[in-house]
Amino acid sequence: MRVIAIVLDSVGIGEMPDSSEYGDQGSNTLVNTARAVGKLNLPNLAKMGLGNLDTIEGVPSMPAKGAYGVMLEKSPGKDSTTGHWELAGIILKKPFDLFPNGFPENLIKEFEKRTGRRVIGNKPASGTEIIKELGLEHEQTGALIVYTSADSVFQIAAKEEIVPVEELYRCCEIARDLLDEFGFKVGRVIARPFTGNYPDYVRTPRRHDYSLEPEDEMLLDVLVQSDIPVYGVGKIYDLYAGRGITESYKTDSNIDGIQKTIKLIMEKQHTCFIYTNLVDYDMKYGHRNDPHGYAKALEEFDFNLPEIWKNMKEDDFLFITADHGCDPTTPSTDHSRERVPILVCGSKVRKNVYLGIRESFADFGQTIADLFGVRKLNNGTSFKSLLLH
């Protein structure tokens, strides 16, 4: 038996009951994207029941080839780390620390001391905008561009020709250690290398995330302890700080992630968990408020879905979900606090089963643990009994 789980990063399906506390009322990544572009052409996701969850222009409601529902986020927050941790069974009591006014001066001073480089920026900003704003000064002085966002992130941007990527990575490791020493609960430190000339800088694919170690036992730990290999595709390794990952496969685009997932399905014929994150929706289109790019990326995934189905075996399960929203049609360029779809199919899965509104993303992880027959996670309610005949 194998479980293949694909997280469509930021593909939310409507506001959470508490969205207004996050300034996200009215957000609905899928519905609003479809409306903005006229319609979405997602015939295969429609077959999995996506159109039964909301009125998505172009995606009809129809009897599903498996099970479908939505999941609510129990943890406070709306970032990838919080979302993925909850998918794996960790519900945060307190949100990660945010820095709407930049990082404290004493932290930055110590960071400068340990890296031997000055810091410029130190404020919330769009990554593409801040390199345009401070890129020249960075080139002239070698200072590191440090910035944050509405998420719990400490980001360091540097031009590859000014600060070699290996040094940038070392600076990120210093930042990770420092934040932990200072007692700040920051989800991720992110290396943001770029290249090119002012004002047309471009970020290179050598981004690297340094995640906070998951604060509790979670799905991947339990699987690996039970000798079930976990194959992480995309940024899965980074989001769990490498915990519970047997092998990791980096990707440079959604299509690369899809192809690597299909290759694993074809090659790894033993019992295993294949866990993929496709980040382009979020990184390339959601944050940049580009509904047309977002729609195209969804359609590209949909087009490749039959290839995944074709390579699944009798006792395989496919789960498709998301980790938060990032509505490209709202004025905000940040993530949105949204519900997420949960779609499941496989030969053993009952047809056209409505899973309802699940109280937590952790139901996803608990169900997968239940299917593998490993010990229960600390959070979540399994819906295995709804899936199987």
Swiss-Prot record:
GO terms for cellular component: cytosol. One of its GO terms (molecular function) is phosphopentomutase activity. Mn(2+) 1 binds at D9, D323, H324. InterPro entries: Alkaline_phosphatase_core_sf (IPR017850), DeoB (IPR010045), Metalloenzyme (IPR006124), Phosphopentomutase_DeoB_cap_sf (IPR024052). This is Phosphopentomutase. Isomerase that catalyzes the conversion of deoxy-ribose 1-phosphate (dRib-1-P) and ribose 1-phosphate (Rib-1-P) to deoxy-ribose 5-phosphate (dRib-5-P) and ribose 5-phosphate (Rib-5-P), respectively. Gene3D superfamilies: Alkaline Phosphatase, subunit A, Phosphopentomutase. The gene is deoB. Belongs to the phosphopentomutase family. The keyword Manganese applies. Mn(2+) 2 binds at D282, H287, H335. Binds 2 manganese ions.
